[in-house]
Amino acid sequence: MDFIELLKVIFLGIVEGITEWLPISSTGHLLLVDEFLKVNLSKDFMSMFNVVIQLGAILAVVVLFFKKLWPFSKEEKNFIKKDTFTLWFKIVVACIPGIVMIPFDSKIEDLFFNPQTIATTLILYGILFIIIENRNAGKQPKVAKLSDITYQMAFMIGLFQILAMIPGTSRSGATIIGAMLFGASRYVAAEFTFFLAIPTMFGASLLKLLKFGFTFTGAEIVALITGMLTAFIVSIIVIKFLMGYIKKNNFKVFGWYRIVLGAIVAGYFLLAR
């Protein structure tokens, strides 16, 4: 892999690290970036690459929130952290709808992976973010901490995650919207979304790897490792930024950004015909 191609892969890793956690759709951005960069690797590999580099992003969540996610304590009397185990059970419950939909993943991708759908979902969920923020303005959230999330609420958030199977939706965007609709604060909605990403994105990456196979060329191995490492580093920065940002600000800016990006995607591919 030459230096220019390596720079392209690094740029894709940067885009993944930023857009995976901000509710602005990594798919929509990667579609635009790939349109201009044209990485010199097979189409099938790039389809798999765009999903598998999420492993780097997942690792960032594990590293940043390890103390909160690790269910065991050094204390002899309280070796098992019950609250953490309960949180993981709720995450498993939230994963159930997605697991049920696994057989339909490829069909949905084949049916909806096009610029028109991506532009539409970018704009639609951008509008939803603005509407929800306007609705919640001045109200105290009913769910102010992770332990307030019930099993029923976790399952409902998982249903919203199914919507992210449609390209352009944004997995984080869909689950944050779902959590906020059920009364979660912005911080809790984002935090639960990040934790839910661990099994969800790991599973999606594993499925893509199994579908593609584990036979890679030297250039493809370099691309995967570089992309994952870049996504990991950028994700660390972005997650820290977002969690600090939403303590004092709302999601409206991301809603407006989605609307503008959706219009750009629609306009570009309409003119490119």
Swiss-Prot record:
GO terms for cellular component: plasma membrane. GO terms for molecular function: undecaprenyl-diphosphatase activity. The keyword Isomerase does not apply. Belongs to the UppP family. The chain crosses the membrane at residues 4-24, 45-65, 84-104, 112-132, 149-169, 187-207, 219-239, 251-271. It is an enzyme of class 3 (hydrolase). It is a multi-pass membrane protein. It comes from Lachnoclostridium phytofermentans (strain ATCC 700394 / DSM 18823 / ISDg). Its EC number is 3.6.1.27. One of its GO terms (biological process) is peptidoglycan biosynthetic process. It is found in: Cell membrane. Bacitracin is thought to be involved in the inhibition of peptidoglycan synthesis by sequestering undecaprenyl diphosphate, thereby reducing the pool of lipid carrier available. It catalyses: di-trans,octa-cis-undecaprenyl diphosphate + H2O = di-trans,octa-cis-undecaprenyl phosphate + phosphate + H(+). This is Undecaprenyl-diphosphatase. Keywords: Antibiotic resistance, Cell membrane, Cell shape, Cell wall biogenesis/degradation, Hydrolase, Membrane, Peptidoglycan synthesis, Transmembrane, Transmembrane helix. Catalyzes the dephosphorylation of undecaprenyl diphosphate (UPP). Confers resistance to bacitracin. It comes from the Bacteria. PANTHER family: UNDECAPRENYL-DIPHOSPHATASE.
